[in-house]
A protein has these predicted regions:
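Short beta-strand His + acidic residue motifs that chelate non-heme Fe in jelly-roll/DSBH
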Residues: 98, 106-111
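Non-catalytic, conserved peripheral segments adjacent to functional cores
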Residues: 1-94, 111-133
């Protein structure tokens, strides 16, 4: 496991007329403030990455489809320096929130043929200045 990366199981509350899917509470580990939330659609088989945020803490949730994430730690002062971590998230199999700290490289791939959506609840607003590709 990469130092600072947290995988938090989330609740799905079944209700008549449609389920409620938890995302992030202010009281939970991983919450580092609120800057913005955005959704990203990933087509089946498409890989998006590599990306690295210099300041942003990402809280990634997959409410629709299935997304595989690969992370890499190049932080020289980290206990997990040069390690990889993989995790696949989906509502049906592994409904969790993936918290990714700044300076960890990551990429992701859509695994569902119909639709794949991830939600990022970020602690700061997105800026190209703090993003490496």
């Amino acid at each position: 496991m990469i130092e600072g990366v947290v995988v938090t199981p989330l609740s799905v509350i079944e209700t008549k007329g449609g389920d409620v899917l938890h995302g992030l509470k202010q009281s939970e580990q991983g919450y580092a403030g609120f800057g913005e939330a955005y959704f990203s659609m990933i087509e089946y088989g498409v890989i998006k990455g590599w990306k690295q945020h210099k300041k942003m803490v990402l809280n990634l949730v997959v409410p629709i489809g299935m997304v595989r994430f690969v992370l890499y730690d190049e932080r020289k002062d980290s206990r997990s320096y040069e390690q990889f971590q993989e995790i696949t998230l989906s509502r049906s199999m592994n409904y969790c929130r993936l918290t990714v700290p700044p300076m960890v490289w990551f990429g992701f791939q859509g695994y569902d043929k119909l639709a794949n959506m991830l939600l990022n609840i970020a602690n700061i607003e997105h800026s190209q200045d703090e993003l490496n590709h």
